[in-house]
Amino acid sequence: RAEVSDFGPILLARALSLNTTQEQALQLIFAWADSQGLELVDLPDLRSVISFLTSEDGKDELAGIGGVSKATAGVVLRALTALESQGGGQFFGAPGFDTADLIRSDSSGRGIISLLGVGDISSRPALVSAVIMFLLADLFSSLPEVGDVERPKLVFFFDEAHLLFADA
């Protein structure tokens, strides 16, 4: 699992198959939520923020964040609904992913193998590629550079690597 805030607007836009304009609107929405101290834990949190910004009460806030149109916000909401209908909502929430979960060993010092099953990849390739990118980015930012070691602490294999480069 990952919190929506941790996943970020760029990877979420990829998972939602948004175009550049819609991705930029999502970035503005994330920035507004951050400026208001709102933590986006799951998709309903993001939906609530977008719904507020497109409501009568939030129209001034919406105008103040760079002119996100109601139509663009509507596209993002529909994309969220589609992602949820494909089971994508199960990925977002708390507690968030912790890199340490992948770097565990048993009492004798042998590594523990962790598997991430994603089921039918063909039904949600954009989400799968975004999740893999999220995991790689999180590992890159949280693991220290150690140079050449006798044994690696982590070995990361993933199938369907071509998904990372589609629309790159």
Model regions and ranges:
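P-loop NTPase motor domains
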Residues: 1-168
